[in-house]
């Protein structure tokens, strides 16, 4: 978040009046354009921070419904089969059918929630302009091209006027303008790549979550039919195994897809932004120090009168590094709190592993006992499988609920202290707009 400093302190004595006025006008245009480009990055960060303000509850609701449905199925299955291990014919199949219907309903709700997120993302990418990364990137690069042309025009103007070209102050000013340009581009680069990574990861996860819930619903439907046609049991358990495998892999695959897309975005942007490779904040501060040294040797009183304004605006640059770290840390933290249990790598591995175990136990026990009508031993295995289901779904419900509560507490705490990402960004935008107003007041 760049910026900026009032640099219109070129002495009229160094050049003819026309060249001086043209230089001041160019400085104003360059600085205001840099400010506007800086706000572009802030707006994209703000959109990322606010993006899931309400939609996160669709995630939470869908995942909780999905897990709750199978929790009901596991509890009823354990009750019916566990209490009738030695009397298999007393198992109430109608109760099991109703329980599996609950499981199907929950997974359908979960799949619908994730599908709705994909749909809303698609609609949002069409109608949203301000925070849409693709549109923002296109506009940023277009405006950056114009900024670079103005900087180049300024360099040519300075080079063609002997007085301007010999001024240490103006040379230092030019270095700082270049450094500010790189700082703004680097900020945009980091923001764009982060937002792209997060959005691609989310989209891939939603797609896989639709698949996870769909295969779970199919498995429940086939298992329901297998109560009356036992030879369908292997097919039902295979669907559960697929669902479990997707549950385990989804967070890893989605985060991997985001990182790959991020690398592509980084490579593409690095070429377009033409960054110097200097540590940007440190380079800006070094250029500012050099400019201040040049100011000390300046004899023109009109320039010295502008120095306090320079010092006030300098605070924006000097606070840039720490603020950028706080904002990015805040965005990452918000992303962490927004993750449901199925998006948490270790929680999803535990949950998916248990569903995978359910399918494996179900298939193995059917092949060994069920198809040979050794029902008592088969019931013991099925009871164990249902207990595993209860454990998995309870973990899913608990981990998702914990993430939701932690996120809401962090939001409430940040709102009270006015230290949320949104608050930091809003304050920064106001500061930049204030500096922009000061720049526009300067007359050559």
Protein language model annotation of sequence segments:
Residues 57-82, 98-126, 197-225, 235-264, ...:
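Membrane-active amphipathic alpha-helices enriched in small hydrophobic residues
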Residues 1-17:
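Classical Sec-dependent N-terminal signal peptides that target proteins to the secretory pathway
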Residues 69-72, 113-116, 120, 148-162, ...:
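A structural signal for well-ordered alpha-helices, especially hydrophobic packing surfaces
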Residues 39-47, 170-200, 307-344, 348, ...:
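Membrane-proximal, non-transmembrane alpha-helical segments
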Residues 123-135:
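Surface-exposed, polar helix/loop patches in the mature regions of secreted/periplasmic/lumenal proteins
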Residues 19-33, 37, 133-160, 264-340, ...:
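Cytosolic/matrix-facing juxtamembrane and C-terminal tails of multi-pass cellular membrane proteins
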Residues 86-91, 133-137, 228-234, 270-271, ...:
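Interhelical loop segments of eukaryotic multi-pass membrane proteins
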Residues 16-111, 117, 124, 170-207, ...:
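Leu/Val/Ala/Ile-rich N-terminal alpha-helices, chiefly Sec-type signal peptides and the beginnings
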């Amino acid at each position: 978040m760049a910026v900026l400093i009032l640099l219109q302190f070129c002495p009229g004595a160094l050049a003819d009046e026309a060249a001086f006025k043209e230089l001041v006008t160019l400085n104003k245009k360059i600085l205001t354009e840099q400010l506007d480009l800086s706000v572009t990055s802030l707006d994209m960060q703000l959109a990322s921070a606010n993006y899931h303000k309400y939609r996160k509850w669709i995630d939470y609701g869908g995942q909780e419904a999905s897990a709750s449905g199978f929790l009901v199925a596991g509890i009823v299955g354990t009750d019916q089969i566990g209490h009738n291990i030695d009397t298999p014919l007393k198992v109430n199949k109608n109760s099991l059918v109703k329980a599996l219907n609950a499981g199907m309903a929950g997974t359908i709700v979960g799949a619908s929630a994730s599908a709705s997120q994909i749909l809303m993302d698609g609609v949002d990418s069409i109608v949203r302009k301000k925070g849409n990364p693709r549109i923002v990137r296109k506009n940023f690069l277009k405006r950056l091209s114009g900024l670079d042309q103005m900087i180049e025009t300024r360099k040519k103007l300075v080079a063609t006027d002997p007085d301007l070209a010999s001024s240490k102050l103006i040379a230092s000013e030019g270095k700082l303008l270049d450094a500010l340009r790189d700082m703004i581009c680097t900020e945009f680069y980091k923001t764009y790549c982060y937002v792209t990574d997060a959005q691609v990861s989310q989209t891939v996860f939603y797609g896989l979550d639709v698949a996870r819930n769909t295969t779970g619903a199919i498995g429940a439907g086939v298992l329901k039919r297998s109560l009356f046609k036992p030879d369908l049991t292997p097919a039902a358990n295979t669907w559960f195994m697929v669902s479990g495998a997707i549950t385990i892999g989804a967070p890893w695959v989605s985060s991997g897809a985001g990182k790959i897309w991020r690398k592509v975005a980084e490579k593409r942007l690095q070429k377009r932004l033409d960054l110097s490779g200097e540590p940007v904040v440190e380079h800006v501060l070094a250029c500012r120090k050099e400019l201040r040294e040049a100011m000390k040797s300046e004899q023109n009183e009109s320039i010295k009168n502008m120095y306090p304004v320079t010092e006030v605006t300098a605070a924006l640059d000097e606070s840039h590094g720490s603020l950028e770290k706080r904002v990015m840390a805040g965005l990452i933290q918000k992303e962490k709190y927004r993750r449901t249990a199925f998006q948490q790598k270790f929680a999803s591995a535990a949950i998916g592993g248990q569903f995978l175990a359910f399918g494996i136990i179900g298939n193995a026990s059917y092949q060994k006992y069920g198809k040979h009508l050794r029902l008592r031993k088969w019931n013991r295995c099925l009871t164990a499988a249902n207990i595993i289901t209860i454990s998995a779904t309870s973990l899913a419900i608990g981990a998702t609920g914990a993430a939701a509560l932690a996120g809401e507490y962090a939001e409430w705490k940040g709102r009270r202290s006015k230290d949320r990402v949104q608050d930091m960004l809003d304050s920064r935008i106001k500061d930049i707009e204030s500096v922009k107003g000061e720049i526009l007041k300067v007359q050559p």
